[in-house]
């Protein structure tokens, strides 16, 4: 597949065949490592040859985004990633917050995060919001939604460190699995440390809910 130009007519067929072969291999790591070494000769075009089926390739995709991502618009990156790394495309996709400031803020935030850049214009917004804190007036506090929740036969998952940036990913995965999603966005209490934001645990426990406390994402972010 590396001998074929990714723009050629037969490339996608060969690309899908390679993905199928990788899926069948019990231990594809050695082959994948060699593949990634050779792939480096492709430069900016290497993204079109990668898949999300092995760890070395995923890491290669992240490195490519850091090296070349800012040369592409958000929509262009979503289009590329939808083929090579769908879950990452889901993360980068838009989520509508019913507020233009939040829409723009989180689209820019995710784009910069995925391309490993901080743009001066965004840095200015962050500095301004540290004082203005518009999100306080835009979003209701989390406690405002607790009494509205239907907790009968409910299972609660408390995923530490999972902010609203992941809502597009969650929404897309729900659609993929045929699940319905009713999403309400709220703000946490400041400071945003977990120890100051667990009041809902006792409230929901008192209502008889089973609560799963998931810290995997928080551990990844901090370590």
What spans do the regions from the language model cover?
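…; additionally, a secondary subgroup of soluble metalloenzymes is captured
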Residues: 1-154, 161-223
